[in-house]
């Protein structure tokens, strides 16, 4: 089974995270940031991933360090779980509606970190979650996993729905990208490596 775990401790956060790419039954998320827990759970369920997260952070300041560091650790675990990337689709994309909102995510497991994030989040805060942290999370994942990630909110009026559509689309796009494909021999690249 393709899986990875990491514990990362800094003066700001302590993150313990385990990711299973091929087994999606066990999802448990506790970061101390309620809305973020909800989004990570949606990502895992819609991507059919196993995900266990325990995070302690300086949320008395704000949720920035916790959200960003969870993204860093998730990216590291994704990179490690994929190992040599042989036999996977490499690319994945998904449109996901959430009522009036529509989110889109496209992923290339390319070995090159890059992110494009587009979307207007009109409500600056949802519970104790600063909505601008949505982009920070995706940036952290993309950079540490060495993937190219395009995340776009096409339209919508409810900020919760917009972010939820993105996290669900992220799960579905990543599922497609990491899926093993019997028609792909070796690495899905003319270079012979990623």
From Swiss-Prot:
UniProt-listed PROSITE patterns: IGP_DEHYDRATASE_1, IGP_DEHYDRATASE_2
- What biological process terms from GO does the record include? L-histidine biosynthetic process
Can you name a GO cellular component term?
A: cytoplasm
Keywords (alphabetical) are:
Amino-acid biosynthesis, Cytoplasm, Histidine biosynthesis, Lyase
| Metabolic or biological pathway, per its Swiss-Prot or TrEMBL entry | Amino-acid biosynthesis; L-histidine biosynthesis; L-histidine from 5-phospho-alpha-D-ribose 1-diphosphate: step 6/9
UniProt catalytic activity: D-erythro-1-(imidazol-4-yl)glycerol 3-phosphate = 3-(imidazol-4-yl)-2-oxopropyl phosphate + H2O
Q: Where in the cell is it found?
A: Cytoplasm
* EC nos: 4.2.1.19
What GO annotations for molecular function exist for this entry? imidazoleglycerol-phosphate dehydratase activity
Q: Which family does it belong to?
A: Belongs to the imidazoleglycerol-phosphate dehydratase family.
Provide the protein name: Imidazoleglycerol-phosphate dehydratase
Per the UniProt record, the lineage of the source organism begins with:
Bacteria, Bacillati, Bacillota, Bacilli, Bacillales
